[in-house]
Amino acid sequence: MAGRVSGQDENALTIAGRRQNDSGRSEMPQGQQPNQFGRIFTPDEAWLARRSPEPILEPGLPIIDTHHHLWIRDGHRYLLDEYLADVATGHNLVSSVFLQCHSMYRADGPAEMRPIGETEFVNGIAAMSASGVFGTPRVASGIVGFADLTLGDRVEPILEAHIRAGGGRFRGVRDSGNYDADPIIGNGASEPQRYLRPEFRAGLARLTKLGLSLDAWAFFTQLDEVIDLARACPDANLIMGHCGGLLGYGPYAGKRDEVFAAWKARVTELAKCPNVSMKLGGMMMRLAAFDYLAMDAPPTSEELAAHWRPYIETCIAAFGPNRCLFESNFPVDKMGIGWAALWNAFKRIAAGASADEKTALFNGTARRVYRLT
């Protein structure tokens, strides 16, 4: 691939350096330089523009983006207009699923109820999109919010409040369990083994009772915990994020082959749980540690497909197209590639699939697992 992968050799993954002035590459604002993995940075639009637009592959193929965020964070605004500006660069997006990101929580009231503000906020965005004034895509036709499932039985009224606030769009919860003992790895969970706690499973039972799904998020080292959760709660609808949480920095740097083997074994075992689906994507430099930001320009779709193909094809082989669904993870993955090239890369990886398999991967599985019309 053009550019480089940071490390001692092309298979080694280490913490990347930042873009330098003397290379002619643009700098990001002070405090925003992408000088380490595991962090979210504001996308550098000038750097992204260094890659010429690509022709759109299979432009008529309907796409449901199963994982994106909407936020104003550290001065970075990514709301309906910004998302639709990316969408307008190509591909046939028909609808999308919003994933919780601690956006617009209520400023007061009981702490456990404050995340309802995010659902209220996104439902307003979704209503704007549903008006048709902003075009044909139906943004946030599914909403995945946050509720603390370790509240156990006490989480039910919170879930019911989300349902009321969601205007018929609320589909489930993401309660992240990703945790690593090394402090360099950014954790979403405040404690290890969150998914093994009896209180969490009691909360999941309440979620399942209400017909809602759980977006699970854990690192590949924790997939045994997700397997245990899926087996213990066979009626739960679990959707695993980001190809199963690959890591390639910190203690995992320079160990790509070792990590791949361990990840593949766990993903294959996870796929034996029929109540689990797998999202395909979310592997930009933040987690898998491909050092795209050290390149003079973003990768092409061919380059990205070459890097991601082993991971995505492994997931599809294990789960099958009817339990896999593509995701943009924007604006997080926009740190390393533009919208049009990202979806071109997914289409290149799926090029050998049948028409029915492509339908499942790009929209059909999403309609089923998120109960979208």
Regions found by a protein language model. Name each.
Residues 12-14, 24-62, 78-86, 94-95, ...:
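Mid-to-C-terminal alpha-helical segments outside catalytic/metal-binding sites
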Residues 31-51, 110-222, 228-231, 244, ...:
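Active-site gating/metal-coordination segments in enzymes
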Residues 33, 190-325, 336, 354:
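Catalytic pocket-lining loop regions of alpha/beta-barrel enzymes
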Residues 59-62, 91-95, 135-142, 167-171, ...:
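Short, well-ordered coil/turn segments that N-cap beta-strands
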Residues 62-73, 240-243:
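Histidine-centered catalytic micro-motifs
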Residues 67, 96, 143, 207, ...:
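Conserved, mostly hydrophobic/aromatic
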Residues 73-138:
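Alpha-helical scaffold segments that flank or form the walls of functional sites
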